[in-house]
């Protein structure tokens, strides 16, 4: 399970009863994309012709800028997760990090959970 049963209100948008503002949500997505980008080369060295994780990072940033919908970012997240499935080790986790970054548009707590797992 990625998310806890009781969600921290700091990672729930105001529209859903939490305290996370839209600007904070966008900032969280940008931070998640930046974190994922730092390790993306670990995936790309294993699968250099697979663009899905890098595309997910780009989509996370595009969502934060208001250029795409949440659904588009979430779709990119799913594709990045798919890229991770047949890998192991650092390459797999780098693809997952990219997917989680794009998933922040859907649920802000995704990146918080992934960051906690990495450290």
Where are these regions (language model features)?
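Structured binding/interaction patches within domain cores
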Residues: 1-119
């Amino acid at each position: 399970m990625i998310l806890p049963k009781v969600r921290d209100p700091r990672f729930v948008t105001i529209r859903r009863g939490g305290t996370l503002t839209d600007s904070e949500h966008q900032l969280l997505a940008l931070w998640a994309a930046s974190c994922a980008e730092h390790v993306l080369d670990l995936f790309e060295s294993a699968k250099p012709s697979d663009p899905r994780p890098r595309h997910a990072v780009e989509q996370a940033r595009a969502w934060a800028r208001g250029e795409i919908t949440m659904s588009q970012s979430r779709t990119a997240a799913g594709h990045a997760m798919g890229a991770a499935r047949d890998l192991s080790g650092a390459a797999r986790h780098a693809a997952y990090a990219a997917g989680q970054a794009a998933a922040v548009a859907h649920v802000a707590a995704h990146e918080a959970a992934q960051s906690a797992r990495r450290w």
